[in-house]
Regions:
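Iron-sulfur cluster-binding cysteine motifs and their immediate structural context
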Residues: 1, 5-28, 39-55
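Short, charged amphipathic alpha-helical surface segments
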Residues: 32-33
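Iron-sulfur-associated redox domains of electron-transfer enzymes in respiratory
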Residues: 51-257
Length: 258
């Protein structure tokens, strides 16, 4: 899954991750450091399949502010929850795509940092030692919101090994994620074709103005070019961009997601 729950749990630093040919990282155990405690297997979410149940209630949510709604990839539910947590002195952990070549989870504690987490990121994020940070915040009584994929939420909960009243988790509907290496390869593909794009402007899902409604959601590969007065994004329909086409068709997901 790549949630790094095992790495965060190992007190002997016996686990490292190595990349396969597609850039997906898999755990490798250093047998000289390993003491066979079994903790890595215990916290692995693969060994704890979630209980399936039907929710008693289901809600459709959008933020009230149309300006805020337009800045979010979907309805802004995660943004609304994050605002509440930050307003009460809590912290939020979520995926940031500000550095598109290293999409990763970050911790924010101020409202002005919220834009770091907005937008859809169709790539596996690097969790690093996020779980350790979260446990530290929980132990001192901070309210924590963690937003991630179902695998990442599952990894966090098995890592913590107990429920916390001050932890809120929000996962999202996910059908799989490509690796960071594949995303970087696609950026390099455009550069080799002579497209001088602004990497910090790349988007996979955006909202465009519409004649029939306030906006419509479009999927594809959107970016700004490094040209004077380039304020209108160039776009490739998802079926014309190799990365987005492979993502939509599920052609290059991690083996555990097939």
């Amino acid at each position: 899954m790549g949630c790094l729950s095992c790495v965060n749990s190992c007190t002997h630093q016996a686990i490292e991750f190595e990349k396969d040919v597609c850039g997906f990282r898999y755990p490798i155990i250093d047998q000289e450091k390993c003491v066979d405690c079994g903790l890595c297997g215990f916290v692995c979410p693969v060994n704890h399949p979630p209980e399936k149940y039907f929710p008693k209630e289901c809600y459709a949510v959008t933020v009230k502010s149309e300006r805020e709604l337009f800045s979010c990839a979907s309805g802004g539910a995660a943004t609304a929850i994050a605002r509440h947590v930050l307003n009460t002195g809590g912290v939020v952990y979520g995926c940031s795509g500000m550095d598109i070549r290293h999409v990763r989870h970050v911790r924010i504690s101020r409202m002005e940092e919220l834009d770091l987490l907005k937008g859809s990121k169709y790539v596996q994020s690097d969790l690093g030692l996020t779980f350790k940070q979260i446990r530290g915040d929980l132990k001192v009584g901070k309210e924590v919101l963690f937003v991630g994929t179902p695998c990442q939420v599952g990894g966090l909960k098995t890592y913590l090994r107990k429920d916390y009243d001050n932890l809120i988790t929000a996962d999202l509907v996910c059908h799989g994620v490509p690796s960071q290496q594949l995303l970087n390869d696609n950026i390099d593909h455009y550069r080799k074709k002579g497209v001088d794009l602004q990497e910090d402007s790349i988007r996979f899902r955006t909202k465009m103005s519409s004649q029939t409604q306030s906006f419509k959601i479009e999927f594809g590969w959107f970016f700004l070019k490094n040209q004077p007065y380039s304020d209108s994004p160039s776009k490739k329909a998802y079926y014309r961009d190799p990365y987005m086409f492979g993502f939509i068709q599920g052609l290059f997901f991690r083996r555990s997601e097939e």
